[in-house]
């Protein structure tokens, strides 16, 4: 999983993906939110694709990720996640 990779390698792929999805897949907006150069964001998104196989150009994949992140946020807001 991306979280495991982040823990093991000190990367930030999970938050990068989450912010990219929350920015409606707008790379400039996501890069600004993450305080990254757009090239760095692109590198991370490519790395995420190679690690997970996720097609970030597929609308169904984006919808699935968006819903997953929103559900996670709701659970965190209610302190329901461990």
Predicted regions and their residues:
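Cytosolic nucleotide-utilizing catalytic cores of signal-transduction proteins
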Residues: 1-82
């Amino acid at each position: 999983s991306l979280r495991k990779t982040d823990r093991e390698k000190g990367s930030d792929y999970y938050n990068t993906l989450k912010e990219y999805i929350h920015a409606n897949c707008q790379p400039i907006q996501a890069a600004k939110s993450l305080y990254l150069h757009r090239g760095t964001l692109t590198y991370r998104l490519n790395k995420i694709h190679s690690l997970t196989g996720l097609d970030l150009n597929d609308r169904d994949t984006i919808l699935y990720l968006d819903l997953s992140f929103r559900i996670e946020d709701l659970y965190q807001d209610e302190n329901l996640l461990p």
